[in-house]
Amino acid sequence: MKKIVAAETGEGVLRLFFHDGGKFRTREVPFAPFVLLADGEAVPEGCTVTPLSGGGFFRRQAFFPSAEACEKALPELKKSPRTAVFRDTVQQALSMTGLRLFSEMTFSELRRMQFLVVPGDDRIAAIRLTLPDGMPRELSGDEAEIIAGFAETIRESDPDVLEGFNCCRADLPLLVRRAAKLKIPLACGRDGGDFTVRQSRYTAGDKQYSYQKFTLAGRHIADLLHAAQLYDAVHRDMEELDLPSLRAYFRIGAEYPPALIRALAEILLPAYFYRTRELPLSFQECLLRGSGSALDALMTAEYLRRGLAIPLPEPARPYAGAMTGMEVAGVFRGVRHCDVRSLYPSLLLNRGESPRRDEAGIFLDTLRRLREFRLAAKDRARALPPGPEQRQQQALQSSFKILINSFYGYLGFAQGSFNDFDLAEKITATGRELLGKLVRVLLDHGATVIEMDTDGIYFQPPPGGSAALDAALTAALPEGIALEFDAEYPAMYSYKAKNYALLHADGSIHLTGAALRSRALENFQRKFILAAVTARLTGDGDGARRAYGEWKTAIANHAVPLADLAKSEILSDSPENYRKKLAAGSTRRSAAYELALTAGRPFRAGDKVRFYVTGTKAKVSVTDNARLLEDGEKSGVRDENTAYYLAKLDALADSFGIFDGKKG
């Protein structure tokens, strides 16, 4: 079955939703929820047991007679280490049937609607929308009519996906709360049902976020804040994660917020759309499941479809990581970057060794298939002229690149049923050895190695050209491993490990690393860093000191806009919850939350608080001397703490060695 846009489990069935012209149709297939049992584990009452072949730990599949019986038994079953529970019944159903959402669809075929709830004083003042055809609509007036109109618009427009920004923390909690208060049903699911909500978590990079997970039967809810956080966890070069900042970062022309959300979704969501076509997960789950968990779902589904037992994960253990680091600091001219194409997936395929408990060899077969599919999509994208079809192929290959690169990480995924820490260690060691070999070739040919990341090297070629060096580097690689010389830069500034700046041929500068562009920095610090780095990259020997002097004078004379001195913080929790945690002693005082509590206007989880520091001494309590930026700008009184900000400028200048000639 193709072009399935959504799937929901019900009593004894999996209900599938398909496009049918401007509407949708449904089809039901039998489904029974299940758990996996180890030998000797008691079978839950009323279950039908199917044996699974192979040497895996969980060798029996117990199917429940009803969803109700499953829900009743789960609390007790979860306590047993000899029972494997898959809480997501849609994942169970897609795993057993082999069906996948969005099969043979393109992202442009999705019916998508964007929304933004405009809050008033503890009420909804308006809801702004972009309909699936891209047309804007605004619901305003009586609050009850706004809420009822929103539900009616969803029913009439029938979107597959509702897209918002920070909607799980702000828009939807307010909408559901006000609808309940006014006793207005939000019956806009494809089954006629309302929104459901539960607490959940997701991980983006090294950060874990709590959020309220909203679901609506037959539809998907995509919060673009989550997608932006996931994007930033990889690229690490976004200064802020609010809509105006993302608009500037991605150079989006739209200003109407729902249209901006729509454009942002078309950049961030296609990779997850195409991942959904491969995995036994809903679109929402694909967006928020980590790569390790997603790949485990894929592996487990293939095993269950073949009637094979599922192994128990290996206990986690430490092992040496990939080769990274900075070799030298300073400014370098004529820098090149070489990259081992898909290093760790290539090493896995080259070695031809599956995880030890992957008896069916599905790991390597799947990696090989996805890699071939990705390369074909990449070739098609290169051959096509600019346009929608090319963008689709680019999104497709990008999505598969992410999935392919997760195979190596899965080996060391603690919760992975097929993890293999010994193999992960071997592959990592081989990668380190290979990169070390490339470094030796570079040094032997007179090149300067500047910075290494997990699969590539920044280097300054030797005088007299790179032809012999390129040939030597390529010859150093084993068969099946390809090296790409993928970029050249007029200059590079290496500050410290994983923190560097690149000057591009067009004059633009790209900063990498938290020390150079962290969101914890105030804007004046970011501007000073950029000025200092630019001076060094462009050969302006006195530029960094000149920038320091200009900023010092401006701060001392209260000439720096307050917005450039302000710090921004996103409230991860509601101010009221912060108050309760503070009273219970489970959190520390926070300037942002203290200001939110005393602001005289409502702040919610997910809102941004911008504040600056007042006072007269360099060392002050920020919490006790913070003032909302909005209040300071309205007052017209310049009460910022110049001593505090001058001390921050001095510390930054010192860290860059501006007065002693260090750091390049």
Regions found by a protein language model. Name each.
Residues 467-474, 478-664:
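C-terminal, non-catalytic extensions of nucleic-acid polymerases
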Residues 457-469:
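Catalytic palm subdomain of template-directed nucleic-acid polymerases
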Residues 1-158, 260-321, 329-332, 340, ...:
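DnaQ-like (DEDDh/DEDDy) 3′-5′ exonuclease domain used for proofreading
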Residues 183-226, 481-490:
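Conserved beta-strand -> loop -> alpha-helix junction used to position metal-binding or nucleic-acid-contacting
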Residues 157-171, 175, 215-292:
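Acidic, Mg2+-coordinating catalytic module of metal-dependent nucleases/exonucleases
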Residues 374, 446-460:
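Catalytic palm active-site di-aspartate
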Residues 171-180, 341-355:
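Short active-site loop/helix that positions an aromatic residue
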Residues 254-342, 346-349, 389-441, 451, ...:
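Common nucleic-acid-contacting/processivity interface regions adjacent to the catalytic cores
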